[in-house]
């Protein structure tokens, strides 16, 4: 029995031992700080000391996984097989290639990031990753949907400068350092203002069509539903039209029908790519378990497959988002936050894993 215990203790990794030692440390809280704040600071410090080693191990794991997949694909091709992995591999390679020319849509999307002060550090990180994914969706779309990131002048900008410094090389994306949304709106021209629509989940006005020469505003906030009617109240105070995507027709959600900022932008891009069919757009963008049914007859929900026929798949976790601020470990081995955005090693594209919370 003692030999088994000895073997198990020897198998424990150095990181696990270090973590246990860290937990056993007697916490002496400095004056003026709460115990929770101080423990968070200690975790931040520990993460800063170990993040390079963690990132290196993660890169090595990804590289090994790619090599294993390549070997399986080579073997399948040599045997004349056409398995699902081989098909997905070639589909993935094609998806990474951005179109040389994009079709103009005459539609603009504004991500209103004026809510900076309402988010904590982790939520700022999540929003920055959502913006990065939105840029990837825009870059790979066959249709050009204009994208402006506004009120880009506080914590969000600091996050980009620290973790995503290459953002200033992004093409066809405008970062606007205004203080308030009304600073960039034609407030004195009612006719021009009528072509601005603020997207919010808190309205019955459904948007069936993205109209040319119109601007659609997405609230750039990750708040886990803390702030009710935030975008609605702001739109009404500015005299803007409001609307929401036809969420209830195509997806099943408990409570408020709220989508992530990146999902809203991706849906707009996919709407154009799928012959202006919201049903097909929702099927491409959202996790399968949230879609009411995989539509086979356009966007008519009456002709869709029953929800029970759609295979349930887990929603991707936020673990891969790798944020920078308020770094906290998710488990005993993997911290939540990271110095870099979620980009693939072979390109400047982010991962497609969702992060919920925006009021849309």
UniProtKB/Swiss-Prot annotation:
For bias type Basic and acidic residues, the affected ranges are 8-24, 33-55, 68-77, 297-306
Q: Where is the composition biased (Polar residues)?
A: 328-343
- Where is this protein chiefly located? cytoplasm
Instruction: Quote the record's binding site residues for S-adenosyl-L-methionine.
Output: 199-200, 219, 223-227, 231, 245, 257-259
Which PROSITE patterns does this entry report, sorted A to Z?
A: SAM_MT_TRM10 (PS51675)
Can you tell me which residues form the catalytic site?
A: 223
Where does this polypeptide localize?
Cytoplasm; Nucleus
Task: Please write the reaction equations for the catalytic activity of this protein.
Answer: guanosine(9) in tRNA + S-adenosyl-L-methionine = N(1)-methylguanosine(9) in tRNA + S-adenosyl-L-homocysteine + H(+)
Which biological process, per GO, is one annotated for this protein?
tRNA N1-guanine methylation
UniProt lists the family membership as follows: Belongs to the class IV-like SAM-binding methyltransferase superfamily. TRM10 family.
Could you describe the subunit structure of this protein? Monomer.
The entry's protein name is tRNA (guanine(9)-N1)-methyltransferase
